[in-house]
């Protein structure tokens, strides 16, 4: 069921006689599985293709996947035959949940063949002509797509990425504070769930009763990606936000949900009440509210002293909200707080799905094999 605290919008009117056919690259991994589950009942998108490595190619999805999510494999996916990573899939666009070792070239091949690519992989996030997108934060960065297509010689294809799982929650919280008060410096320490490492991920002997104070490449992503997300597109390049940002990233024995302890300095003086108000009042536009996966208030502020907690709060807003608590004065900077976001939903599959919904609503999908005569439905509860 949808959380009643987070009203879902009505489906948009764009291309109202179409349902878009979707493929998932890397469909057998954890993020790929989450995408398959989210797509199973989606009112706008129909899952028609699943693709993975040659090891899985030719098998039915049910026989190829080691299913790790709650509930059974969705019926729509069970009997789909897993294809290889060749850009000849019968779909209108693809999600990429591929490992970074193969994602870079594969995503370029699909885009060059005319497929819009919604990527969860790191490879193209910081490319100078590729939008790194959180719709509530920087939807205007989609203006870079036409430049990318011209720059790379793509026709109808393009690449849009979503950020690192920890970056996603952090920037959702930073956005209303940047708009209201301006930001100067951010210091963040993460406590990241093991599901963020994929499967089999971190060995149980390494993580059980332990904390691992290193995640390869994670701190670099958290220090660079917010600069692009909170920056601007000037027509030919992205101009970074120019923030001072330092990150420490740790793997902890939690299944789902990344917790982040954040201290920050503001350009304008603000009381704690004003900071809480800015976070609570952060509301998406009418355009975004019409998207099936959107939550009207993507930042939720809790007053309890011991919240947020991954076990209790990771699924707030169907996993699409960032949950904030412990907003207080910082003796070194200005304000400190704790935030939590679901790393596999907002930080991965759900974020990519919301990106695709915005692209569909704005008419970026031209359609290779559109199912005609099926109207976009009202958003469904998941």
State the predicted function of each range.
Residues 2-214, 237-238, 243-244, 322-323, ...:
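N-terminal Rossmann-like NAD(P) cofactor-binding subdomain of oxidoreductases
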């Amino acid at each position: 069921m949808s959380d009643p605290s987070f009203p879902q919008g009505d489906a948009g009117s764009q291309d109202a006689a179409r349902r878009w056919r979707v493929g998932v690259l890397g469909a057998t991994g954890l993020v790929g599985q989450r995408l398959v589950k989210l797509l199973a009942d989606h009112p706008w998108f129909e899952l028609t293709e699943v693709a993975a490595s040659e090891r899985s190619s030719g098998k039915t999805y049910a026989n190829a996947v080691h299913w790790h999510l709650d509930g059974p494999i969705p019926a729509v996916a069970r009997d789909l035959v897993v294809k290889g990573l060749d850009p000849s899939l019968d779909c209108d666009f693809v999600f990429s949940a591929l490992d970074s070792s193969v994602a870079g070239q594969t995503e370029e091949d699909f885009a060059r063949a005319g497929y819009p690519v919604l990527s969860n992989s790191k490879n193209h996030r910081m490319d100078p002509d590729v939008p790194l997108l959180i719709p509530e934060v920087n939807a205007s960065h989609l203006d870079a797509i036409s430049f990318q297509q011209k720059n790379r010689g793509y026709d109808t294809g393009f690449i849009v990425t979503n950020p690192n799982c920890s970056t996603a929650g952090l920037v959702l919280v930073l956005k209303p504070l940047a708009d209201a008060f301006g930001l100067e410096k951010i210091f963040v320490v993460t406590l990241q769930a093991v599901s963020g490492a994929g499967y089999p991920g971190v060995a149980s002997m390494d993580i059980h009763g332990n904390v691992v104070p290193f995640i390869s490449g994670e701190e670099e992503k958290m220090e660079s990606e917010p600069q692009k997300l909170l920056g601007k597109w000037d027509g030919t390049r992205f101009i970074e936000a120019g923030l001072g940002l330092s990150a420490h990233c740790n793997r902890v024995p939690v299944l789902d949900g990344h917790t982040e302890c954040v201290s920050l300095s503001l350009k304008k003086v603000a009381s704690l009440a004003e900071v809480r108000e800015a976070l609570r009042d952060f509301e998406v536009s009418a355009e975004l509210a019409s998207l099936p996966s959107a939550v009207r208030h993507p930042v939720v502020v809790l007053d309890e002293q011991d919240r947020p907690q991954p076990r209790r709060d990771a699924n707030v807003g169907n996993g699409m909200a960032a949950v904030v608590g412990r907003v207080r004065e910082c003796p070194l900077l200005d304000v400190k707080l704790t935030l939590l976001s679901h790393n596999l939903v907002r930080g991965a599959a759900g974020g990519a799905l919301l990106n695709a919904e915005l692209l569909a609503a704005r008419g970026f999908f031209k359609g290779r094999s559109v199912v005609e005569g099926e109207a976009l439905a009202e958003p469904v509860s998941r």
